[in-house]
Amino acid sequence: MAGREYPLERTRNIGIMAHIDAGKTTLSERILYYTGVNYKIGDTHEGTATMDWMEQEQERGITITSAATTCHWTLELEHKKAPGALEHRINLIDTPGHVDFTVEVERSLRVLDSAVGVFCAKGGVEPQSETVWRQADKYNVPRMAFVNKMDISGANFFNVVDMIKSRLGKNAVPIQLPIGKEDTFKGVIDLFEMKAYYYLDDKGEQIEIKEIPDDMKDQAEEYRAAMIESICETDDDLIEAFLEGNEPSNEELKKALRNATISVQIIPVLCGSAYRNKGVQKLLDAVIEFMPAPTDIEDIKGFDEEGNEIHRISSDEEPFAALAFKIMADPFVGKLAFFRVYSGTLNAGSYVLNATKNKKERVGRILQMHANKREDLDKVYSGDIAAAVGFKFTSTGDTICDEKHPVVLEAMEFPEPVIDVAIEPKTKAGQDKMGEALAKLAEEDPTFRVRTNEETGQTIIAGMGELHLEIIVDRLLREFKVEANVGAPQVAYKEGFTKEVDIDSKYAKQSGGRGQYGHCKVKFSPMDVNGEKVFEFVSTVVGGAIPKEYIPAVQAGIEDAMKCGVLGGYPVLGVRANCYDGSYHEVDSNEMAFKIAGSMAFKDAMHKAGPILLEPIMRVEVTVPDDYMGDVIGDISSRRGRIEGTEDNNGSKIIRGFVPLSEMFGYSTTLRSKTQGRGAYSMFFSTYEPVPKNVQEKVLSNKTK
């Protein structure tokens, strides 16, 4: 069998991320066109984008799911293949920009080595740009910025660069300048080569390289000097030479910029218009020149069976370890598990260990995905992103690895859903079908939850926003042929603890014959509801007071009971449980008895621990003309909002603040009337906070009506 097609050094794993409508998918489509994957340019406006393959994406012109594909690129120099340049493999993931699908961005960034942040040349840093940027910060992902839509009215490259510096707190360094803007945008100036690149034809394939226009020479010199200084500041050898008045060579500068990009000290900024086919090839060159290969990234950390930290190097010679970052139901091949290989190799047909669940899995087939098309592979190597068919137990965030060398890699944390709706099938016969379909959709999407309201028996689905749940209901009908009636969206309240309590819980049924006996003592205490974990269970039982095999049953009982709080039947967040003692019966004890004892312990604790109602707080950003600012701020305050700050942006005011989600229903209509249709807003989930007492009483009394 042939070995690896491309060495690791010539592999790039990149994501495309941005605010909605910044042009991510259009950029991805142009990348596929220029790298020869597509022979025709896909278009989100016409619903023909390769990467937006779901029917819902094509109808709405937005990205919903992150699509993965692979393409190849050889460095271009003066629009000729660079002498001695070798072809590189690029694994590309296009992610959604809509806040409701933030999970897709989170899991993609977890497994990618780098990302291209796309910014609209007019809108600049928008709310979701900030969200995805913070997600990339969390995983310390190297990235570069592409200022897109340089051809549209109001485009301002320099304003966007300033916004990246001020709003994202990053050292954004332009390595290109635009030639013209709006309808006069013709090309870019390369600040390394100090040449002008003009795009002559509609498809951007005929490029003319000329001297920098006279009226831009001073500006180009100024920005080149600033670029050199920024790069030199990240390299001890270069800064020394620079301060002595010696300008480094382009080769030295590019090498230092690559190191600074990989260590997230610098964000190189490029520009273009993906829709008008300008600047995309130069972006691909920059990806090859400045973005990391898997070998440039820090060793991946994990834990062995004893909980000791171990490291895996990105090498084919290491034992196999990979992270499953996405599960998808494919109508043709069944359950697909997307995974990123961090070390070692994997053959189709072999067995692996799911170290997270301690279950053996068989790799039926390995597929290379091209959006929703697939190609069979015999083997995958370190650094690869692929999908496996045949896994039964694996879910998002699980580690799969070599059975002889178990390791558990750091899992992913996902936000809690903020909106609930009640759902029921239109026919009685559809009940089971709907249950199965919802379970499959919940397996795919960790931010989508399904539960049953114990009081009414209704099925409640919860997600990150109205669009998120609308897409779920649409998929029920299209993919699973289940017609459903859906209630009005409700706020997904949660419940929490305020006090520490110590509970002694015994479940005993011993009235002749085989009995039931489970007894546990558990200390419950509140923990941060917005931390990385919303529930933590520890066992400090000693001396076999409770046999080891029954401890997980106590935990399962507590987790089950947490699905329904005592105030309004809402799920409970922010609980730490320490099972420290108990007792058992040689004959009558079993898992079920301890599960019931755990459940009873939690319900008892919930009544005694000062239960409170928690509500989702949204980060809200409103853009309005100056004249309406006072009215809009007053309205936000009347909605229990907290104003964080305001700033000027192109003649408008941006108001930022935090508002409870319950107060934001119908806000778009209010904003329209207060600003005569000239205001715009966006919001995304920030935290869960306690509901004020007077509001809590109102919410709970409305629920019982």
Curated annotation (Swiss-Prot):
What is its subcellular localisation?
Cytoplasm
Which CDD domains is this protein grouped with?
EF-G (cd01886), EFG_III (cd16262), EFG_mtEFG1_IV (cd01434), EFG_mtEFG_C (cd03713), EFG_mtEFG_II (cd04088)
Task: Read off the SUPFAM superfamilies from this record.
Answer: EF-G C-terminal domain-like (SSF54980), P-loop containing nucleoside triphosphate hydrolases (SSF52540), Ribosomal protein S5 domain 2-like (SSF54211), Translation proteins (SSF50447)
GO molecular-function terms, A-Z: GTP binding; GTPase activity; translation elongation factor activity
- Give one Pfam family: EFG_C
Which family is this protein grouped under?
Answer: Belongs to the TRAFAC class translation factor GTPase superfamily. Classic translation factor GTPase family. EF-G/EF-2 subfamily.
Under NCBIfam families, the record lists: EF-G, PRK12740.1-5, small_GTP
- Protein name as it appears in the record: Elongation factor G
- Gene label: fusA
